[in-house]
Amino acid sequence: MNYLKQYESFFWLIGIFIFYLIMAILTPLSTTDWHAYKVNLSQYLTQENGRYLGHLFEWVAVHNVILKALIYAITSFLVIYIVVYMVQLHTNRIYFILSFVFMVTVPNTIYSETYGWFTGFFSYIPATVLSLFILFMVVKIIESHDTVSEMQLWVFLLVSLFGQFFLENLSIANSLIILIGMVVYFFVKKRLSYFLIVGFMLSCIGNIIMFLNFNYFLIKDGLNTHYSISDSQGMIHKAGVTLFKLVPQYMFINQMIILTAVSYT
């Protein structure tokens, strides 16, 4: 009995992983997923938008059931693990359980666009994992650069580049996170961080590679019937509204209200 108690947290984590394995097996392929199944890899990557790694993972997943289940389960598990690890609560199983419960009780509209189909999953969830890792590393570098291992720094640089090929919004967000981290690091430490500078440059290179995809030029010109800009005044106006109105509102103002409310509960 004591032996089982000692490894109770491990059993919970295995249970969460197995749950996502089962969900991957039970989730049917959507029309878009079948399209990825029917075409060869080079054709799929050249015809679609700049989410190159997302499309690569999706293509591999729909062609191999075992890899599909493993990638789905590992990525879903990493979201929970990184969230709990970021707040240094990974030693207590209750926080893994709470995070898992919150993840599986999201509104069905959100679930259907993320976990409910593999095209959405491989665009949103890996991008979320990598963005969380970038945020974690930026905060850790600012707080105490000496505690960051060399391996973590090299992984951070790789993620800064390759994390840009999943989702447009998070690709831009990754660059902003690193840029803000550079500024904060300079004011706190009175010097520049080599790794943050290189990470920012790599993230910008990734953004350039992504947005040079011809589909984005078709979207800008209104020639792509599958994708469109949700702003009648064009792409530049939409970008301005997003950057100067929506981002401050939902990243800072609303979050401060939420955090203030939580602090008094």
Regions found by a protein language model. Name each.
Residues 1-19:
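Start-transfer (signal-anchor) and selected internal transmembrane alpha helices
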Residues 152-174:
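Membrane-interface alpha helices of multi-pass inner-membrane proteins
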Residues 72, 76, 123-135, 173-181:
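Hydrophobic core segments of transmembrane alpha-helices in multi-pass, intramembrane catalytic enzymes
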Residues 73-95, 133:
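Transmembrane-helix motifs of polytopic, lipid-linked glycan transferases
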Residues 23-67, 169-176, 183-264:
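Transmembrane catalytic cores of multi-pass membrane glycosyltransferases
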Residues 3-4, 84-94, 142-149, 185-195:
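Membrane-interface helix-boundary motifs at transmembrane edges
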Residues 47, 51, 101-139:
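Membrane-interface micro-motifs in multi-pass membrane enzymes
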Residues 80-85, 132-143, 156-160, 176-185:
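Hydrophobic transmembrane alpha-helices
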